[in-house]
């Protein structure tokens, strides 16, 4: 009987762990951590509308600010991570932030790094109705400018 309970507990634990990994639950660390290695990208991002997205949404005089706005105007829908920071597109970085992991793209992806696609951008940048989403070509161009600089990992 004890063995059956033990096996059931092991199976349930395995399912819980695999479900958590599949869901992509990775802790967010904030752009200041990313800046430690990605200084050029951070400096390029810092002056963009993405960086100021939370402030801009709060300053809007024609719309009331709500928690729903944070889905696109903050990272991880949290005022603790204001603006559209690195992890809004690349996923929570706690599990891939170490240089030993980041120097291997496949290892970084296995630890939660998301390589954004157009669909990633479309999560917020589609449609003309601001009650849903808005397209700002300026923001999309800023995204390209941020990633124009490549910092290869040191050898």
Predicted regions located by residue number:
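Short sequence/structural segments immediately N-terminal
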Residues: 3-7, 21-155
């Amino acid at each position: 009987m004890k063995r059956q309970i033990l096996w059931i507990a092991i199976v349930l634990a395995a399912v819980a762990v695999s479900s958590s990994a599949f869901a992509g639950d990775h802790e967010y660390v904030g752009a200041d951590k990313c800046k430690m290695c990605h200084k050029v990208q951070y400096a390029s991002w810092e002056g963009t509308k993405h960086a100021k997205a939370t402030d801009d949404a709060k300053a809007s005089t024609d719309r009331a600010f709500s928690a729903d706005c944070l889905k696109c105007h903050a990272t991880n829908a949290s005022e603790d991570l204001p603006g559209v920071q690195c992890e809004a597109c690349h996923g929570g970085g706690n599990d891939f932030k170490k240089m030993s992991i980041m120097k291997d793209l496949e290892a970084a992806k296995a630890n939660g790094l998301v390589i954004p696609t157009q669909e990633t951008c479309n999560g917020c940048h589609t449609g003309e109705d601001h009650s849903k989403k808005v397209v700002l070509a300026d923001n999309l161009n800023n995204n390209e400018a941020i990633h124009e600089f490549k910092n290869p990992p040191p050898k």
